[in-house]
Amino acid sequence: MVKVFAFTFFSRQVRKCIPMATDQKFDNSFKLRYLKPKFWVNWFLLGVLGVLSFIPARVRDFFCNLVVGLLSSFTIKHKKLCLINLKACFPDLTLKERKCIYRDNLRVGLKVILGYGELFFRGDKFIEKSFMVTGREYLDEALATGRPIVFMAPHAWAIDRCGIYLSMIGLPMCTMMHSSGNEVYDWFMNSMRLRYGGKVYERNSGIKCIIRALKDGYHAYFLPDQDLGPKSAVFVPFFGKDKASLVVLPKIAALSNAIIVPFFACYNEERHCYEVVLEEYFRNYPSADLTADVRKMNAATEHLILGREKQYMWFLKYFKTNKPGETQIYGLRNPKVQKMYLED
């Protein structure tokens, strides 16, 4: 009865909260204009990634350990955003503790970035050996239901690399992307994402294209922690601080009969490989209570991050949408923000 009510409720709300789809898939074909001089720097950087992809991960990681301190002095804005987010989510941490997490976070990010070229330049056997999986039994359990799966994946440094794992093991995957504005970069990133097949939709295509793909037998990748503004969001606690949280996940589940599997992407610094973390799929989801469903999404996201803080992209503006009267915590030049978030 609850499922029938939820389906009816979400169906009535879909026109309000989910943009119409145009099925605008990313065009991954190579264009001659990509060879224009304005892209030469991009091609040089891709060449560097190509060379790095053939250097053992242990050697690359050792280099990252050496230069992370120097790099932190050139990433002032990212550092401040990271410290602000950590203060908002973990108010009991001292400034020294937050700076330590930031340094670890930057080191992990650098190791992942320098390994980007592997998905483009290395062979299948190499890629297969670069993964370890925690919780594979939860994936098998979800697949046994015969229903489409939405992998709920928070923003982690290794999110693209570990997302490839799902396609690599034979799952038909779809996801959405937001263009960076750099055609060569987008072509490179989506060439990696589509290495083992699947579909990548432009974000402006709307969520209905994902729902249609799920009904057609695909599985989807969903980022639950995005802040896309007050529209299609409710304010629900995230690590104790109210956040404008997306309401589309329970709607997708209701309209496509999909199940939700928490998914986290890690770079394992000890083993120099990528770790896919899977957890048990949501039971009785969605319910008739939209806010409770969004809270469950945030709670699952928190659980994935705790103990793996250095893997999470803390420099993103997860709390940029404020309630009326609230101070914008990302006002880096605001003395109140400086005192509250960037000092002990």
PLM segments and residue spans:
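Catalytic core of membrane glycerolipid acyltransferases/transacylases, capturing the structured
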Residues: T145-N204, D227, K231-V234
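Non-catalytic C-terminal accessory region of glycerolipid acyltransferases
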Residues: A21-Y34, C100-R103, D140-L143, M168, ...
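Active-site metal-coordination segments of metallo-dependent hydrolases
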Residues: K80, S179-E183, D242-L246
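Hydrophobic alpha-helical segments typical of transmembrane helices
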Residues: G47, C82-N85, F188-M189, V248, ...
